[in-house]
Amino acid sequence: MAQKINPLGFRLGVTQNERSHWFAQQRNYSKDLREDQKIRTCIENYVRTHIKSSSNYGGIARVEIRRKIDLIKVKIYIGFPNLLLIEGRGQGIEKLRNDVLNMLDSVDRKLHIAIEKVAKPYRKPNILAEYIALQLEKRVPFRKTMKKAIELAEREEVEGIQIQIAGRLDGKEIARVEWDRGGRVPLQTIRARIDYCYYPVKTIYGVLGIKIWILEE
């Protein structure tokens, strides 16, 4: 039988690196892990509600978190940085930092947030998934959306991409799974640099699940 496994965890330490860098005692591990999830959720919600790009979606590729005793360093990799999120050009980062600190409810720790622009945003599965979700919310046909997403990725010179959408597609009564692929995506090879994301999107017909695998050069 085939075994399902997360492609990022499968390659951790070989071609993928950790998104969180810290050590904790056993009694504090679950607390810090939940805090990491809260920080990522707070950043994503802030970008979606306050900082809209010209493409009408946030474009967060990934969020890396590093912890020290009294300092939390957060680096946001974003595809389409708004001027408010560029350091020294607005109050966006300061407001985001205050929102995260209020959410953590901690006064004895410092928080540093840095922004880094992604050179080729459509090589990142999270940004492509957000683009697909936006099109599905606008009731664009899912096959047309998948082909357009593959075209955008191929313009960024990816070696291969696979997209899968599951749910009540086009409002049909029976849920199903549809997928499309461009290039090669060897999921069984650990040495292949596969980037992956899962992105749920709410539509008027229900929740659709988007999965994207991208083979980097």
UniProtKB/Swiss-Prot annotation:
- Its domain of life reads Eukaryota
Q: Where is the KH type-2 domain?
A: 47-119
Q: Which keywords does this Swiss-Prot/TrEMBL entry list?
A: Chloroplast, Plastid, Ribonucleoprotein, Ribosomal protein, RNA-binding, rRNA-binding
Q: Name one Pfam family in it.
A: Ribosomal_S3_C
CDD domains named among the record's database cross-references: KH-II_30S_S3 (cd02412)
- What PROSITE patterns does the annotation carry? KH_TYPE_2 (PS50823), RIBOSOMAL_S3 (PS00548)
- Which GO BP terms sit in this record? translation
Which Gene3D superfamilies does the UniProt entry name for this protein? 3.30.300.20, Ribosomal protein S3, C-terminal domain
Where is this protein localized, as stated in its record? Plastid, Chloroplast
GO CC terms on record? chloroplast; cytosolic small ribosomal subunit
Q: Which family does it belong to?
A: Belongs to the universal ribosomal protein uS3 family.
Assembly mode: Part of the 30S ribosomal subunit.
Q: What is this protein called?
A: Small ribosomal subunit protein uS3c
What organism is listed for this UniProt entry?
Pinus thunbergii
